[in-house]
Every structure is written in structure tokens, then in C-alpha cells.
Amino acid sequence: MALLLLRMGVSVALLVAFFSSLIPSSEAYDPLDPNGNITIKWDVLQWTPDGYVAVVSLYNYQQYRHIQSPGWKLGWVWAKKEIIWAMNGGQATEQGDCSKFKSNIPHCCKKDPEIVDLLPGTPYNMQIANCCKGGVLNSWAQDPANAIASFQVSVGQAGTTNKTVRVPRNFTLKSPGPGYTCGSAKVVRPTKFFSQDGRRTTQAHMTWNVTCTYSQIVAQRSPTCCVSLSSFYNDTIVNCPTCSCGCQNNKPGSCVEGNSPYLASVVNTHNKDSLTPLVQCTSHMCPIRVHWHVKVNYKEYWRVKITVTNFNYRMNYSQWNLVTQHPSFDNLTTIFSFNYKSLNPYGVINDTAMLWGIKYYNDLLMTAGPDGNVQSELLFKKDPKSFTFEKGWAFPRRVYFNGDNCVMPPPDAYPWLPNASTRVMSSILLPFITIWTALTFLMVYA
């Protein structure tokens, strides 16, 4: 009876754990960037007769995930009947119903405003610091100076003291599609600001923070990249797994043949404002392919060539980045044509590298075609304790492109050393050979 109750208890616990895992959470976990998030900081700087003036800033603390054009969209729901009188450095996408105002019409009267960044070239009297980049928000490791965005908002019909102000709720962040989940606003210590000479400090009247984390599952996106492998010691080229990012279908326009005589007209007439990739017809149907080639074996070093190919006719990837995980990054000696930074997600273990293009040279990955690729070579020093070409050790454990996890080939498909098949066959035949030898011995000497 006790054993039955124990089994029932374990079953219930497993069911609870399973269903609780289905409940949406504001926390997401990326094993290569466990602390990555976008923090929204709301600083109330000035009280007004019917509200306040605040500066809202977005800090992208993600190491390698950035927001590309057409940029971020930040939304929330007002706690009471607040309105937005005016804005600098950003704008609400809709004004809403402001018909009750006879004069001095507000910038936005919606209960749930959605804010976007202003474009580069905006007049100076409409700008503030860290604004007007078209919603582009770079990653913290790649370009920390441009990993911040800000706008100023004048709020009316709101509280005018720390005790009467009500923080907004239900924050949303789009990039521009789904993927981010935001927690509740939390009042924190007021932000302090330092004068240019560093001799005076001022502070906000009130500050609250909102933390938003990204999940590829929440984004409901199919994979956007895949990995192919090859080596100097094996003629086999392991392609991306079939249907890595989708499968070809009979629907016209689902992909474009790279050698089609009508290629230019198809690409030019397609809706370029759409975020849906227009990809070249391949077996994997991914917009991006990362190829890892084990190129040369030296006495004390070994060399790898990485090629990133764009199969998307609809997008140039600006400020692209690549994250790869391999134990030999602790012994990386030289990298050509790319920038490099060690991420160290596990502290002392240096096995994760972030790679990105050199500004004005290859930081822009062009659309699909002859120029739609970037490449680099990496030189590693051999560690006698761990280095081997056996069993696919020389290939990466994980690969991310622009923060998205790429589809890897199955490990049993990796290029093996030429004598690997002989070793495997020998290990299989060894028991049979032993038995046959024993039987022969018995027959002869019995």
C-alpha cells in the first residue's frame, strides 16, 4: 500500500511539473547567455500640473541578440486614464480618440499605446540622446554604445507625486514580431545622473524597471539557420538536414530557383517590406547556412574555415553575428577577417566565441547571390590532453546566427577519419572472431 501511494505521489508530481512548464513565464533561459535580457527603465524627471515628464530607455543586455530594422515596438496599458501630451525621440503609432479635447490635442489618447523609434535624420528639436536609429538596437557584446535606445514622454491626467503615480502594466516588446515576454514593472531606487565634469549628481524623482526576455518558442518561429560540415580528411560533405527550416512545396513563390532566368524580376516584384524570407530553393530551405570546414592539420595547430551564406533574397543582414561553441576556443590563436569575443557563459570555461564582421568590410551580409556570403579562418593550438579528429570532435557543439539556434546535422553523420569504419567493423567482428577461434581450437585438439 505504501509503495502504491509513493508511485501515485510521484505521478502527481510529474503531472504538476509538466503542466506548470506550459504556463507562460516572463523568464526565458539561453544556455549561452543565461543573463541576457532587455531592461526598460522609466525615469520620472519632472512633475507637471497634471502629470510628469519621463525618459524611457531600453537597454539590450543580451550578448548577441539584437533588433534589426524595422526595429522595436514598445507597448503598455495605462493604469488609469493617462494620456501622452508630447514626445521626443519616439512616437506613438496611433493617436487614438482625442475628441474630448477641444484644443491642445494630445499626441496619444490610447489606453494601450505602442511606441516606435524615430528615423535617422529627425530634426534636432525632436531628438534626445540615444534616439532616432529606426528602432535598431545592437547587442551588448558587439556594440554597447548602440545597445541603448531612449525617448521622452510627457504624461497627462496622471499622478503628480511619488504616492499618486501609478505604473503602467502589461508591457509588450516586439522586435518587430513576437518573442519577448515582459514582467511587471518594479519600482526601484531612483536613477542617478552625473554632470559632465563629474562633480555634481542629480537623480530621478521616481524610477521603475521592466525586464523582457526572449524565447524562440514564444516567437513561434521555425529555425532560421542550419549548419553543414566538411573536412580535409574525408570527402563527405555533410549538408544541412533536409527541411531544417521548412520544406519545399508546390505553392508558387515559396522559394526561388537560383539559376532561374526570371530571378531578377521575381525578386524585384516581391513585397520587400514583408518580414517573411524569400529564400533560394534548397533541400534545407533556410535563409542562412553556416559551413564549418576542418581545413588543415599542422604539427602543433589546426585550422578551420567558416563560411556564412545568405539564401534570403529579401534581406541584407547588417550587424550580423555568429556564436559557436567548441572546447578549442580556449586555444584560439588567430582569427582572420572577423571580430572575436569570448563569452564565457560558464565562468572559467572558455568554449564559446562570438564572431562578427569588421566595420565597412564585411559587417553587412548581402542578399542571396554571388556576394551573399562572408568567410573567415580560425587557427587553434592543439591541446595534447583533448585534441583529436576522431568521432567528430573537431566540429562545433552549437551554432547561433543573430541569436537563433541553428539546426545541426545528427552526430552520426559527421565526417569521420577514413579508418573509422575499419575500427567500427573490427569492434563488431571481434567477438565472432574470438568464438570462431575457440571452436576451431576445440575441434582440433579435442
From Swiss-Prot:
Q: Name one GO biological process term.
A: plant-type cell wall cellulose biosynthetic process
Q: Where is the signal peptide?
A: 1-28
Keyword Glycoprotein: yes or no? yes
Compartment(s) where it occurs, according to its Swiss-Prot or TrEMBL record: Cell membrane
What's the protein's topology in the membrane?
Lipid-anchor; GPI-anchor
Please report a single Pfam family linked to this protein: COBRA
- Gene of origin? BC1L6
Query: Residue positions of GPI-anchor amidated alanine lipidation?
Result: 420
> What's one GO-annotated cellular component?
plasma membrane
Swiss-Prot/TrEMBL keywords: Cell membrane, Glycoprotein, GPI-anchor, Lipoprotein, Membrane, Signal
Upper taxonomic lineage: Eukaryota, Viridiplantae, Streptophyta, Embryophyta, Tracheophyta
Annotated organism of origin:
Oryza sativa subsp. japonica
Name of this chain's protein: COBRA-like protein 1
